């Protein structure tokens, strides 16, 4: 039996589903959930089955694919520029500080692209593959289903410098987080709080945690917002001057499940990285009521997350004749140039 996103629709309800379909269809005039119905009807099956297979040996991959989509969209829009390798024309975004030695899942996207090129040659963009993969990853981890607006095309360049400045840092305070989100067009408080909920599964490296354990903001003391018991545990996992690449679960309770436990953790002072805990521990912040609400009612979080994901997925998409449909997600397509020799013979090179 092939993978299908439809099995979870009844859980959402017909009325909500209808509203979401309308919202997704109207969110960008040229993107629509049924974009591949006629040209590649099994695109969800192909991508979903590969993720199911990958999860058997790599439980982290679902969170990694969601993060990859997030890091793509925050840099000049959702155009798969993050997937491009180095070339003579540009430096890859994979080398940027927020991605280097931490962004992962590229080989899985490659596998999806190969399978889709066999089934539907030249039809499905890498940008849409990444968008669909993030949605299915959330679904397979216990999260909601939503209609994904599709029809994006792929960038023909990468943006290394922008990737170094546009992506939110794990060391950001709340003001910096809001600015980073607003700069790309996500200016609702619910965008920030709901999308941060993507840290309800997955891992982070100790190098992004240790400053708040030992020398928070140069104080030579730990972050005072940290739960004391949690601080002891994190110091055990991430000793001072230890291996910065050691992985720690974002969520100590349900580390591989997409649920609302992340927000409960924040309320208990158990946010793993500074930028997460800032949502609840910043005095008087307008993010606090949303953290409380999402912690208390997972369905409210799921609805907010769906809305924010659709909004993020529609950041500056390339559509129509813009960009291209890459044959290989790691490189731009060969440029075809028509030339005429001295004898009047025309050829392509």
From Swiss-Prot:
One matching Pfam family is peroxidase
The UniProt record gives the binding positions of Ca(2+) 2 as: 200, 251, 254, 259
Q: One cellular component GO annotation, for this chain's record?
A: vacuole
Tell me the residue numbers annotated for binding substrate. Answer: 168
Tell me the keywords, alphabetical order: Calcium, Disulfide bond, Glycoprotein, Heme, Hydrogen peroxide, Iron, Metal-binding, Oxidoreductase, Peroxidase, Pyrrolidone carboxylic acid, Secreted, Signal, Vacuole
Q: Which residues form the signal peptide?
A: 1-29
| Cofactor(s) it depends on | heme b; Ca(2+)
Q: Residue positions of the PTM Pyrrolidone carboxylic acid?
A: 30
The positions annotated as site (Transition state stabilizer) read 67
| Disulfide pattern | 40-120, 73-78, 126-329, 206-238
Entry annotation: catalytic residues: 71 (proton acceptor)
> Where is heme b bound in this sequence?
199
Mind telling me which PANTHER family this protein's record contains? PEROXIDASE 22-RELATED, PEROXIDASE 72-RELATED
Protein name as catalogued: Peroxidase 22
């Amino acid at each position: 039996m092939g993978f299908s996103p439809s099995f979870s629709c009844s859980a959402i309800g017909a009325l909500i589903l209808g509203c979401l379909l309308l919202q997704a269809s109207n969110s960008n005039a040229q993107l629509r959930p049924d974009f591949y119905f006629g040209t590649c009807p099994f695109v969800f099956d192909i991508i979903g089955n590969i993720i199911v297979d990958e999860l058997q040996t790599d439980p982290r991959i679902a969170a990694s694919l969601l993060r990859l989509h997030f890091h793509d969209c925050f840099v000049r829009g959702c155009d798969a520029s993050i997937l491009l390798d180095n070339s003579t024309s540009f430096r890859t975004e994979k080398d940027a500080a927020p991605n280097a030695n931490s962004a992962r899942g590229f080989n899985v996207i490659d596998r999806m692209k190969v399978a889709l090129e066999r089934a539907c040659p030249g039809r499905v963009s890498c940008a849409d593959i990444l968008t669909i993969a993030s949605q299915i990853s959330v679904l397979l981890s216990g999260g909601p289903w939503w209609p994904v607006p599709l029809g994006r095309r792929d960038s023909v360049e990468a943006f290394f410098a922008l990737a170094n400045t546009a992506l939110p840092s794990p060391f950001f305070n709340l003001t910096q987080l809001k600015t980073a989100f607003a700069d790309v067009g996500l200016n609702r408080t619910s965008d920030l709080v709901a999308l941060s909920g993507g840290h309800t599964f997955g891992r982070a490296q100790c190098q992004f945690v240790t400053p708040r354990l030992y020398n928070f903001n140069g104080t030579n003391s730990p972050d005072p917002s940290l739960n004391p018991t949690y601080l002891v545990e994190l110091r055990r996992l991430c000793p001072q001057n230890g291996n910065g690449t050691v992985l720690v679960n974002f969520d100590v309770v349900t580390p591989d499940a997409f649920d609302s436990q992340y927000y409960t953790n924040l309320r208990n002072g158990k946010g793993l990285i500074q930028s997460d805990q800032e949502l609840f521990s910043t005095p008087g912040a307008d993010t606090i009521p949303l953290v409380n609400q999402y912690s208390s009612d997972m369905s409210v979080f799921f609805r907010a997350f769906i809305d924010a994901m659709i909004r993020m997925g529609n950041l500056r998409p390339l559509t129509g004749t813009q960009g291209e449909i890459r044959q290989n997600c790691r490189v731009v397509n060969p440029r075809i140039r028509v030339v005429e020799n001295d004898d009047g013979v025309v050829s392509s090179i």
